[in-house]
UniProtKB/Swiss-Prot annotation:
Cofactor field: Ca(2+); Mn(2+); Mg(2+)
Disruption phenotype: No visible phenotype; due the redundancy with MNS2. Lack of complex N-glycans, shorter roots and increased lateral root formation in mns1 and mns2 double mutants.
pH sensitivity of activity: Optimum pH is 6.0. Stable from pH 4.5 to 6.5.
GO biological processes: carbohydrate metabolic process; N-glycan processing; protein glycosylation
Protein name as annotated: Mannosyl-oligosaccharide 1,2-alpha-mannosidase MNS1
Cofactor details (free text): Ca(2+) or Mn(2+). Mg(2+) can be used to a lesser extent.
Topological region Cytoplasmic: 1-27
Domain of life, source organism: Eukaryota
Coiled-coil positions: 47-80
Gene Ontology CC: one annotated term: Golgi cis cisterna
C-alpha cells in the first residue's frame, strides 16, 4: 500500500520534470502542443470577454434603435423636431453680412498662418505664436470645422495636412481634461463628421486614449489635469481641497459618446456615463450643484453654485446629450436631470431696477449674489434649444425667459463705451448693471444664444443684435495681424492674444446667424460647448452618421 502511494507520487512528478521530455522527442512535442493549447485557451477567453463587451454594446444599440422606431411610430412628444426657421429666398442683407464674417475669418486665419502656424494661439501685436495648450495646435484644430463650413477649401486642406503630419500628442504636458476634450477631441470629431476623413477620427481616438486614465478614481468622477505622456492625473492645486470642478468633470459626455459611436468601442461612453450616473444618485431636487465635487466620494463641497464659470457647461451637456441621442428613452435621464436644473435656474432669476433686466444670480449657501458672468449668456440659447421638449405652456415660458436673458446679455455689450461686454456684471438696486471685471477676450456666448434664438423663432431682431456685436469687434478688436481682446472695455486698451475660440465659436456662430437654417441644421447636428457640430445619432445606434456634402457657394450642408 505504501509502495503503491510512492509509485503514484513518482508517476505524477515525473511528468512535471522537463528532463523526462527532453529524453523523449515525442513527449517533448506533446508538451509543446499542450502548452500552446492552454495558451490559446487563456488568450481566447480574454478576447472572448472583450468581444462580449463589444457585442453587448452593439445589442444595446440595436435595442435603442428599435425603441426609437417605436417611439416614432407612437408619435412621441419628446422626439418632435425643433421648430426651426424654414429656408426662404435669401435676404441680400444676410448674404452681405455673411460674407463680411467670412472675410473676418480669412483675416484671422491668414494672420495665424503667417505669424503663428502650428502654435496654439496667435499673439497679433507681437506677431508671433504661443503654445498656451502645450503645443496641441489649438487654433488649428479649433478652426477646422469653421473653415469647412465657410467653404474655405484651400485653408482646410492645408490645416488637414498639418494635423496628419505634425500633430503629435506624445507630450510630457499636464493637459486640462476640459480644454483638451472640447477643443481637440471635439474639433477632430467634428472635422470627421463633416468631411468623412478617417484621419481625424484616428487622431481623436489617440488623444482620447491618453485622457482615459483621468477617470480612474473611486467614483469615476475624473481628475481634471492629466499628463499626456505618462497618464498621471490630479486636480488643480488651486481647487478647493483637491476637488474636481463640476464643469470640467461633466463636459466630456458629448465628445466621448460620439467617439464610442464612431469607433464601436464602448469604453469612452462608459467612462463619461458613469460620472452622470454617480452625480444622479444624490441629485438635488433643484438640480443645482456647487462647482466643486469630491472625486473620492462624489460629495459636493460647500461652494458657489453658478451658471457661469466652472458650472455652466455641466447643465448645457445634460440637455445636449439628450439632443445628441435623438431625444429617445435611452437618454431621457439626461433630460430629467436638466429639467430639474431648470427649476433651480428659475429660483436664481431676478430683475434689475429700474430697467427690469432679467439676470441669473449666483448662489453661495442660501445667499443669492447679484452677479452674472458673460459666460452665463450661453443660457438663453440653451433654454431656447430645450424649450421644445416641454408642453406648450412651459415651452412658451422658457422661450420668453430666453428672450429676456438675451436682451440683458446684449446690453452687457451696449452699456460700455466700446460696445463690447466685460467679463462679468453686478446688479445694484436702482442702478441696473455695472461692469465688474472689465476685460473682453472675444467670447462667443452671447452671439451663440442669438444664433439659437434666431434659428428657433425667426425673429430678425436677434440678427440685428449680432450684427452690432460683430461691428464692435471689427472696430475695437481687429488689428493688422489678426484680432485681439481688450484689457478694458471702457478704455479700449488692447491685449495681445487671439483666442482659438474666436475662430471656433464667435465667428462660426456669427456666420451661421446670417446663413440659411439648412446650414448645420439643428435637427441634424448638436454643437459641443466649443461650437464643434457633431452629427445627431440615436443613442447606441450602430448606424454611422450621415456625412454631409457641401455646396461650394455658401458651404450649405446637404445630406446624401
Amino acid at each position: 500500500m505504501a509502495r503503491s502511494r510512492s509509485i503514484s507520487g513518482y508517476g505524477i512528478w515525473k511528468y512535471l520534470n522537463p528532463a523526462y521530455y527532453l529524453r523523449r522527442p515525442r513527449r517533448l512535442a506533446l508538451l509543446f502542443i499542450v502548452f500552446v493549447s492552454v495558451s490559446m485557451l487563456v488568450w481566447d477567453r480574454i478576447n472572448l470577454a472583450r468581444e462580449h463587451e463589444v457585442e453587448v454594446f452593439k445589442l444595446n444599440e440595436e435595442v435603442s434603435r428599435l425603441e426609437q422606431m417605436l417611439e416614432e411610430l407612437n408619435g412621441g412628444v419628446g422626439n418632435k423636431p425643433l421648430k426651426t426657421l424654414k429656408d426662404a429666398p435669401e435676404d441680400p442683407v444676410d448674404k452681405q453680412r455673411r460674407q463680411k464674417v467670412k472675410e473676418a475669418m480669412i483675416h484671422a486665419w491668414s494672420s495665424y498662418e503667417k505669424y503663428a502656424w502650428g502654435k496654439d494661439e496667435l499673439q497679433p501685436r507681437t506677431k508671433d505664436g504661443t503654445d498656451s495648450f502645450g503645443g496641441l495646435g489649438a487654433t488649428m484644430v479649433d478652426s477646422l470645422d469653421t473653415l469647412y463650413i465657410m467653404g474655405l477649401d484651400e485653408q482646410f486642406q492645408k490645416a488637414r495636412e498639418w494635423v496628419a503630419s505634425s500633430l503629435d500628442f506624445d507630450k510630457d504636458y499636464d493637459a486640462s481634461m476640459f480644454e483638451t476634450t472640447i477643443r481637440v477631441v471635439g474639433g477632430l470629431l467634428s472635422a470627421y463628421d463633416l468631411s468623412g476623413d478617417k484621419m481625424f477620427l484616428e487622431k481623436a481616438k489617440d488623444i482620447a486614449d491618453r485622457l482615459l486614465p483621468a477617470w480612474n478614481t473611486p467614483t469615476g468622477i475624473p481628475y481634471n489635469i492629466i499628463n499626456l505622456r505618462n497618464g498621471n492625473a490630479h486636480n488643480p492645486s488651486w481647487a478647493a481641497g483637491g476637488d474636481s470642478i463640476l464643469a470640467d468633470s461633466g463636459t466630456e459626455q458629448l465628445e466621448f459618446i460620439a467617439l464610442s459611436q464612431r469607433t464601436g468601442d464602448p469604453k469612452y461612453q462608459q467612462k463619461v456615463e458613469k460620472v452622470i450616473t454617480e452625480l444622479n444618485k444624490n441629485f438635488p431636487a433643484d438640480g443645482l450643484l456647487p462647482i466643486y465635487i469630491n472625486p473620492d466620494n462624489a460629495n459636493p463641497s460647500y461652494s458657489t453654485t453658478t451658471f457661469g464659470a466652472m458650472g455652466d457647461s455641466f447643465y448645457e451637456y445634460l440637455l445636449k446629450v439628450w439632443v445628441q441621442g435623438n431625444k429617445t428613452s435611452a437618454v431621457k435621464p439626461y433630460r430629467d436631470m436638466w429639467e430639474k436644473s431648470m427649476k433651480g435656474l428659475l429660483s436664481l432669476v431676478k430683475k434689475s431696477t429700474p430697467s427690469s433686466f432679467t439676470y441669473i444670480c449666483e448662489k453661495n449657501g442660501n445667499n443669492l449674489i447679484d452677479k452674472m458672468d458673460e459666460l452665463a449668456c450661453f443660457a438663453p440659447g440653451m433654454l431656447a434649444l430645450g424649450a421644445s421638449g416641454y408642453g406648450p405652456d412651459e415651452e412658451k415660458k422658457f422661450l420668453s425667459l430666453a428672450g429676456e436673458l438675451a436682451w440683458t446679455c446684449y446690453n452687457f455689450y451696449q452699456s460700455t463705451p466700446t460696445k463690447l461686454a466685460g467679463e462679468n456684471y453686478f446688479f445694484t438696486a436702482g442702478q441696473d448693471m455695472s461692469v465688474g471685471t472689465s476685460w473682453n477676450i472675444l467670447r462667443p456666448e452671447t452671439v451663440e444664444s442669438l444664433f439659437y434664438l434666431w434659428r428657433l423663432t425667426g425673429n430678425k431682431t436677434y440678427q440685428e443684435w449680432g450684427w452690432n456685436i460683430f461691428q464692435a469687434f471689427e472696430k475695437n478688436s481687429r488689428v493688422e495681424s489678426g484680432y485681439v481682446g481688450l484689457k478694458d472695455v471702457n478704455t479700449g486698451a488692447k491685449d495681445n492674444k487671439m483666442q482659438s475660440f474666436f475662430l471656433a465659436e464667435t465667428l462660426k456662430y456669427l456666420y451661421l446667424l446670417f446663413s440659411p437654417s439648412s446650414v448645420i441644421s439643428l435637427d441634424e447636428w448638436v454643437f459641443n460647448t466649443e461650437a464643434h457640430p457633431l452629427k445627431i445619432v440615436a443613442r447606441n445606434d450602430p448606424r454611422k452618421p450621415t456625412i454631409a456634402l457641401r455646396q461650394r457657394k455658401f458651404g450649405h450642408q446637404i445630406n446624401v
